[in-house]
């Protein structure tokens, strides 16, 4: 758990050689975690470079500020885009008369993004990091433009899918850029800074969306990305972003696409992911879980995924998701930990507003304000924990502490009732957010500090996929738990109220359909059902603590390569 084995080092050298055959792999017969290579002239062993490989020094000063500002704004916009549409959806469905399409406004983005994420790792591994990142962001902006000018519901769905394709490579690219710009001990602080500010987009999305919808038009929920995108373009266009690993030279783009991106693996993986996520989307909503459609989607996803695994095994280290990498304990535990943490975040982000709107009776805008304590404490701890990891070197204690505090915070949410005081729901949320913030970036730091540079983009892509996969799965489980619990609890606390009428009415309109004498019972049933959903989040938080133990005890300060010399290109 503490250090990389000799076998892993040999695997790393082989994978580096296969990924970049024109490069001489480093000599791996050494002690410790940092690979070494022998100089051609004097035979002196030197640390293998894990920073810029294009002769530039680490990025500092105003150039680093410009790069960090640019990628943070991009990640902020991406997370804003996932939540801003929620308050605009009623107005959109009214204009397009498209109530049956509501689910597709979110799932079109998710399906496109999740199916492309693993491929983005190979793209960043083989193409210029800066222009790959800018290209993904440009596709995201194109999707936003299509949504803004949409003349029909179908056009809006297509725009959301295009935006999802662009969004698939944004977070991966941001972490890859940070890895190439600064030395090891500075990465945790910058990663925490990026995640802390970017995640504000999740909470202010409904506020901004509600304001646009009420005072201008819902189209500005998408137009807002365009002027900010222009600012990002100016910040990044004139700044040189160093490469963390050498990219293939003298090889045509067509050759890279055909030989290095593992398109067959992508063609197998994408439909497997789409079928699985569609089954989760349809199950219990459009179709029953035991319907032929849902069962067929699950079976199709399973069969296609088996074919994908066999192909990846055949491809070996050239695969889209190399088997030898996923077998590394640090990698797969980091993926699982990040997935469970994101599941707790998404469950709370969806069901805390339901608690405030349905049970406390506030509007959508105010419910967004009421969940600020968890998001602000999460952002603050993300920044603080990242800085302290960079200062003291160890990420594992923060991940373990984050799992414990997040478990306690989610556990306290299960005590919510219609009469829970303001002080309690603020304090509980602060604790919950602090736990998430302390641990959220630790899987990324662990992967970056336990893998050779050529594998970092692939690992980041895998972690980002787990974010979508675990999030979608847990939200589907949460929906099943909430709906079934609400039916049962309504029979217990409000037996005279038909359960289906409450479910169909929705979280904000059921009060108008319930007799005054039955409302307290309905509110209690709603509250108990939300509590049961938070039990699911408790389980996910406990799992983050358990799997964090496999991420390794490592001092990242001892993994510092010498700073390259040379003039920085701009």
Swiss-Prot record:
Glycans are attached at residue 290. Its main location: membrane. The gene is pigP. This is MFS-type transporter pigP. InterPro entries: MFS (IPR011701), MFS_dom (IPR020846), MFS_trans_sf (IPR036259). Belongs to the major facilitator superfamily. TCR/Tet family. It comes from Monascus ruber. The chain crosses the membrane at residues 65-85, 99-119, 131-151, 162-182, 192-212, 221-241, 263-283, 293-313, 336-356, 369-389, 392-412, 425-445, 455-475, 533-553. Induction: Expression is positively regulated by the azaphilone pigments (MonAzPs) gene cluster-specific transcription regulator pigB. Residues 14-54 are annotated as: Disordered.
């Amino acid at each position: 758990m503490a250090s990389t084995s000799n076998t892993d080092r040999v695997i790393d050298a082989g994978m580096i050689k296969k990924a970049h055959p024109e490069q001489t792999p480093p000599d791996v017969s050494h002690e410790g975690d940092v690979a070494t290579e022998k100089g051609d002239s004097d035979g002196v062993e030197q640390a293998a470079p894990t920073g810029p490989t294009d002769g530039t020094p680490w990025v500092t000063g105003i150039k680093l500020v410009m790069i960090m500002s640019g990628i943070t704004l991009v990640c902020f916009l991406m997370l804003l885009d996932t939540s801003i549409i929620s308050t605009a959806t009623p107005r959109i469905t009214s204009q397009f008369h498209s109530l049956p399409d509501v689910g597709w406004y979110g799932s079109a983005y998710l399906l496109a993004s999740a199916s492309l994420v693993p491929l983005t790792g190979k793209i960043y591994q083989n193409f210029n990091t800066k222009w790959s990142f800018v290209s993904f962001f440009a596709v995201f902006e194109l999707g936003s433009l299509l949504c803004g000018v949409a003349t029909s519901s179908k056009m809006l769905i297509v725009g959301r899918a295009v935006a999802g394709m662009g969004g698939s490579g944004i977070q991966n690219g941001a972490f890859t850029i940070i890895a190439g710009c600064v030395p090891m001990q500075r990465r945790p602080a910058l990663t925490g800074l990026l995640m802390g500010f970017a995640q504000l987009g999740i909470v202010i999305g409904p506020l901004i969306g509600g304001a646009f919808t009420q005072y201008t038009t819902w189209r500005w929920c998408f137009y807002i990305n365009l002027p900010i995108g222009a600012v990002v373009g100016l910040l990044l266009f004139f700044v040189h972003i160093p490469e963390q690993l050498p990219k293939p030279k003298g090889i045509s783009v067509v050759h890279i696409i055909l030989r290095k991106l593992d398109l067959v693996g992508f063609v197998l993986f994408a439909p497997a992911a789409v079928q699985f996520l569609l089954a989760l989307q349809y199950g219990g909503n459009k179709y029953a879980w035991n319907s032929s459609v849902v069962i067929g989607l699950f079976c199709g996803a399973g069969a296609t995924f088996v074919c994908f695994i066999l192909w990846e095994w055949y491809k070996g280290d050239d695969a889209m998701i190399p088997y030898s990498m996923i077998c590394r304990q640090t990698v797969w535990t980091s993926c699982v930990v990040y997935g469970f943490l994101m599941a707790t975040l998404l469950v709370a982000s969806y069901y805390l507003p339901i608690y405030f709107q349905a049970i406390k009776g506030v509007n959508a805008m105010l419910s967004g304000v009421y969940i600020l304590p968890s998001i602000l404490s999460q952002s603050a701890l993300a920044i603080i924990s990242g800085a302290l990891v960079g200062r003291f070197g160890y990420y594992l204690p923060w991940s373990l502490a984050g799992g414990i505090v997040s478990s306690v915070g989610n556990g306290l949410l299960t005590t919510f009732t219609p009469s829970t005081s303001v002080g309690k729901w603020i304090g509980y949320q602060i604790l919950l957010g602090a736990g998430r913030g302390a641990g959220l970036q630790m899987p990324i730091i662990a992967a970056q500090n336990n893998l050779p540079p050529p594998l970092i983009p692939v690992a980041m892509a895998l972690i980002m996929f787990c974010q979508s996969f675990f999030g979608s799965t847990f939200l589907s489980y949460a929906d099943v738990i909430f709906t079934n619990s609400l039916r049962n609890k309504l029979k217990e606390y409000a037996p005279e109220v038909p359960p289906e009428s409450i479910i169909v009415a929705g979280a904000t309109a059921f009060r108008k359909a319930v007799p005054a004498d039955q409302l307290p019972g309905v509110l209690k049933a709603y509250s108990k059902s939300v509590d049961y959903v938070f039990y699911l989040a408790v389980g996910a938080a406990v799992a983050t603590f358990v799997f964090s133990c496999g991420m390794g005890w490592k001092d990242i300060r001892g993994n510092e390569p010498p700073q390259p010399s040379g003039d920085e290109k701009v």
